[in-house]
Amino acid sequence: MRQPPKAVDPVDPTRVRTLPAHFAWLDHRLRDRLRALGLEAIALLFFLHLAADKTGCSFWADATIARKLDLREGDVIAARDRLIAQGLVAYRYPLYQLLPLEDPQP
């Protein structure tokens, strides 16, 4: 049986973060899928997590996202296509939807 992780002392105990009411979360299983995405898709996915409502939806325009991420609009569209292909995002203009992660099939 796996032991619970031991508590660690923070490096800077005066700056321990707390979760704000508007907290956005990322599924820890994304760690194992980042390599398949590329930097632009990772940036877009992170942005969409920050922008999403409680159902995972957001209405940000590609041009606005591009400006916020310092990307070209075409890069945002290509990143979106990659996220769709990986099953991480659904899109119907102008709505983005973050999808729940499914465990990979063996």
Identify the role of each PLM range.
Residues M1, Q105-P106:
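Short intrinsically disordered terminal tails
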Residues M1-G56, R67:
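Short recognition helix of helix-turn-helix/winged-helix DNA-binding domains
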Residues L34, A51-P104:
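Winged helix-turn-helix DNA-binding recognition segment
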